[in-house]
Amino acid sequence: MTTQIKFTTAEEAVKVIKSGDHVHLSSVASAPQCLINAMCARGEAGELKDVHIHHLHTEGPAPYADEKFEGVFQLDSFFVGGNVRKVTQSGYADYIPIFLSETQRLYRCGAVPCNVAMIQVSTPDKHGFVSLGTSVDATLAAVETADYVLAVVNKHVPRAFGQAMIHSSKIDYFVQDDTPLMEAHFSEPNETETAIGKHCAALIEDGATLQMGIGAIPNAVLAQLGGHKNLGIHTEMFADGVLPLVESGVINGEAKNIDKGKMVSTFLMGSQRVYDFIDDNPAVLMMDVGYTNDPYIISKNDRVTAINSALQVDITGQVCADSLGTKFYSGVGGQIDFVYGASLSKGGKAIIAMPSMTNKGISKIAPVLSPGAGVVTTRNHIHWFVTEHGAVDLYGKTLQERARLIISVADPSAQEELDRAREQAQAGLLMGLESVQSRMSHLGASGLLYGRVREADELL
């Protein structure tokens, strides 16, 4: 089936948005900036009010989150990216806590309405199909449920396969804009990150299926895998770090039980090299987040190794990955989806990896989490914990055993105080730690975060 595509302007397309509507924006590099700008122009002209904006992580400007649009646009994001972090922490914008796997369900079950989906797609092929490119995630569900779908057709959007392909008959308005996609570039891992990468790599077996995100620690892990064999990818996102391993044949997906020989992801962010890699590449499946992040689907592959990071971990194994004390820094994301999926996988390993200290010299391992900190991965879910000082297996360990193990990979300068807190709490661990916290909150200045997070970046 083919469809005659008629283009219009961004200004004309966004006229379908009404006051009170809920608008979805496609994610990461696929945020449709020309439509966003046209929507905001209507807001400035006083034509809109109480429009709710929903999205996952997006790159680029987020003008709708400017406080001048109070009463016009309300951001209710599914993830807090750097471009909306300050307004979310200030309380001007809001956040919907949700497992990444369930973001698509919010639209499909009607918990969050979707009146208008604003997306970015590839150039149509001869059959009238376009690709969602770098952002399938919850965007596919938004397209399926929206009253109106507005699409920016961009020749730079890669033609990705899997569930990324949609027919142009599903789209109501087309706008042409060939602005190059946003790119992400990462610095080389430092000494600490390299040490973490080596410890994680030692836990990865030949034939493992990997999940990891983007950034310094995932890149440090990937850099250590050149001697491995028959690795696979089933993840929520990937970036440049996987490409050398694909080119060398280390990543080939041959040991996977499902999607054999395929790399599976739901969104991605990287350099132009990554976008070129997935373009017209049948070895990459860009899938709905309800598939990629379903723990049951994840567990179907053997030796799933999920590597995720944290902002703070307490000595019982509670993992905070979304907030700095009471201030949201990112979001729940897909961490627990993959931690649980890996734990159900035959031979799987769920790994939490982080530097032992912040960049301000404060221990990220604490007797208890900072007040207000969110628990993303519970102490019941955590298996392996890794810092630059080593890797410890917490599975099946008692509270006291895991406390000793976690302390053993803390920075040496923090271990004595952490162990003292453990000893004082031994008689009644959780109640004891609360008592320790109240007596030792002054120690925050000397390197442990007990009482509160004084500044929003203390845990970074």
For each of these PLM feature ranges, what is it?
Residues 1-415:
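Conserved alpha/beta enzyme-core scaffold
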Residues 317, 413-460:
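Mature, solvent-exposed C-terminal subdomains and processed small-chain segments of exported/organellar
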